Each structure stands twice: as C-alpha cells, then as structure tokens.
Amino acid sequence: METVFEEMDEESTGGVSSSKEEIVLGQRLHLSFPFSIIFSTVLYCGEVAFGLYMFEIYRKANDTFWMSFTISFIIVGAILDQIILMFFNKDLRRNKAALLFWHILLLGPIVRCLHTIRNYHKWLKNLKQEKEETQVSITKRNTMLEREIAFSIRDNFMQQKAFKYMSVIQAFLGSVPQLILQMYISLTIREWPLNRALLMTFSLLSVTYGAIRCNILAIQISNDDTTIKLPPIEFFCVVMWRFLEVISRVVTLAFFIASLKLKSLPVLLIIYFVSLLAPWLEFWKSGAHLPGNKENNSNMVGTVLMLFLITLLYAAINFSCWSAVKLQLSDDKIIDGRQRWGHRILHYSFQFLENVIMILVFRFFGGKTLLNCCDSLIAVQLIISYLLATGFMLLFYQYLYPWQSGKVLPGRTENQPEAPYYYVNIEKTEKNKNKQLRNYCHSCNRVGYFSIRKSMTCS
C-alpha cells in the first residue's frame, strides 16, 4: 500500500505558521515528468468520448439494446475511476467541494492530471529558486519554499499511485466488456465504421496497459515493493505477451458470444464464478479466520465487503488475461508475493482449453453465418496468437525476469523513490511548546517519504 499524506494546517501544527521554523533536508527526491498519468488520462478521455459518440449513433438508429449496454459500460467505468481517485486522495475526509464537483461531472482524471503537471512545474521552479538562495542563513522564506517542495513531491507520488490503480480498474471493469460488446456488434451487422474502430482501439490499449500494470505490481510485490526498471527488450516482451493474450482472448469471447447469443451466457458466468469463488474456497479449506475484532460486527462486515470487492476485480482480470498474482485471503497481505509456476501453468492450461472449445463452437456453429470466408483460418490464427502469448510469457519469466537478471534497483522502493528520509525540524517559540506537531505522513505504509521530528526550545 502507498503512504498517504495530509497537508498541515495551523491547528494540527499548533499554530506553527507564526513560529520560527528550521528545515533540515536529507537526500533530494527526484521526480520525473508524469507521463503515465497523462497516458492514463488520454485513454480515459478517448474511451469516454468515442463511447458517447457511439451512444448517440445508436440512439439515432433506435438501437436501444446496443445503446443501453454502451452507455452502461461507459458510466460504470467512469464512476469507478472517480471513486478510486477520491479514495486514494481522501477527498471525502476533507473540504474539497471543487474537486468533488469535477468528479461528479466525471472530469476528475482530467483535473487531477492538469494539477499534477502544474505541481511538477512548480517543483522545478522551487528547486531552481532554492539553488539561487544564499546559504548564509535559513529564513522563513526558505522554510515555506522547502514546505512547498515537500507538498509537490507528496502529491506527485500519491497521484501516480492512484492513477495506476485507476488504470487497472478501468481496463477490466469497463474496457473489457466495452471491447467485447463493440466487436459483437461489428460481427452481427458486418460493419466496421471508423468511430467504432477508434472506440475498440482505445479499449484494447486500455486493457493491454492494465495488464502490464498487473505485471509490474506483481514484480514489485515479489521483490518487497522494490522499484523496477525494465530495459527495452524486457518491456517489449511484456507488451507483446499481454497484447497477444488480450486480443486473442477478447476476439475468441466475441466470436463465441456471436455464435450462441444468449446461450453463451451460462458458460461465461461459470468461467467467471470459478475465478471468483476459488480464493474463498481455498480460504475455507485452510480453516483461517478473517482479520479484525470478532466482537465488532461492523468491522467484520466491512472486512468481508472489502475482500469480496477485491475478489470481484481479481475474477474480472482472470476472465480476460492472467492477473500475475494469486489471492490468498488467509494471509494478512492478501496477495501472495511468491512466484508460483504451478498457479501460472494451471491458469494458462485451463484458459487455452476454454479458448479452443469456444473457437470450435464458432467454427462449427457460427463461422459460416458470421464470416463469409476464412473462418478456419481465423480460428487457427486465434489459437496461434494465444500460443505465442504463452511463449512470450515463458520467455520473460525464464530469462528476462528482473529478479533473476539483476534489474531491481537496490535501495529504492515503490514507496520510497530515492531518498530514505526527509526530515523537517521545527523550532517553536515558548508560546507553542506545549502543542505537539502532528506527523502529516500517515502510517498506512511500511516506509514513508517523510519523517518528521520535533525539537522544542527549553525555557
């Protein structure tokens, strides 16, 4: 989990704004330009914009069925994105009416992206101004400058983490059903207009990006939250693996649904509920107990609800591709950080069998009606694409995995980018010496970006 920070106000710091402050810096944190946040925002905007445009086209054509599902997947994905961003930034605990207003309008990712870019340029400006300051004496101006730098760093890393989780949830709870639906519509009416193709392209990019994020998260967990840096060859291998896996699985599902129509629904529900119930069956078999106070029923209900939501997302990921992690509800960490070849091989074996069965159903029941020709060739290409994806997966874990090839950056963690500590020492006057300085780095993580200590003058 990430460390979440709160800004310091006068009440929490005991009126420290009117006191003499001294800031002692540790190692300087380095921030990079938020390209990942911009990319996630572009995917969000593109998918929502083209989805709304297709909704308008279906509405004018009186296609109520397709119109309803298209707008439903857009709204569900967009609302979940707003909830994730507000959850990580703890907006509901603060008086942030303006940000809440933008989230209600489903424009939260755009506003936060622009805010992060502004903070990054503000951080660069403050660093440049800090270097120009004389080091003869530390004034209150220097104190406020260092605090602005600290807040910029805190906000940048918090937004990066929030957008990472937003990308995963948007991909597998919004983009996957949207991509399957639009492909099903194209197969049914045998038309591929440019607008629908662009919507499918953004959805495919979103799912692939979310799958890559799952891989990076799994590698960080297996290496104790250590930051990784994949060279171009390793990154290309992961991209090809995830792209081929996602495209072959999604096209297979679309062909299967188009072949059997509503008769395919029970099969798809069985596949989904197997992934959903498997962690709970393993938890029940282990005989473990849920964490928390058994006497507090509300706490127990909240824990069960949170675990159920996690398993819903876990099953949605495994429905379209491999989640790269294994849920272990009996453990306090929930996610098993060990690399299990057995779990990996079992997943790909069963999913390959599912794909072959669905492709055979398409070949013998829907190939002639959905496609005028080349149904056998397409079926073979789908199987070969999935086998190629499995081959890239084996290549990555056997020869290019960062833990084995020494590409883990020592001394750096996801929660601790480059500097181990960032100390803020505050000397307060005798008027405020009985008021305690609140640590604005919450302990929701093992290691914080900041460590605050207080020095008080003795009368």
Swiss-Prot record:
Q: In which tissues is it expressed?
A: Expressed predominantly, if not exclusively, in testis.
The places in or outside the cell where this protein is found are:
Cell membrane
Q: Where are the transmembrane segments?
A: 35-55, 68-88, 97-117, 169-189, 199-219, 238-258, 264-284, 300-320, 345-365, 377-397
Cellular component (GO) terms are:
plasma membrane
UniProt main location, coarse: membrane
How is it placed in the membrane, per its record? Multi-pass membrane protein
Keywords carried by this UniProt record: Cell membrane, Membrane, Transmembrane, Transmembrane helix
Of which family is this protein a member? Answer: Belongs to the XK family.
Name of the molecule in the record: XK-related protein 3
Species, as recorded: Homo sapiens
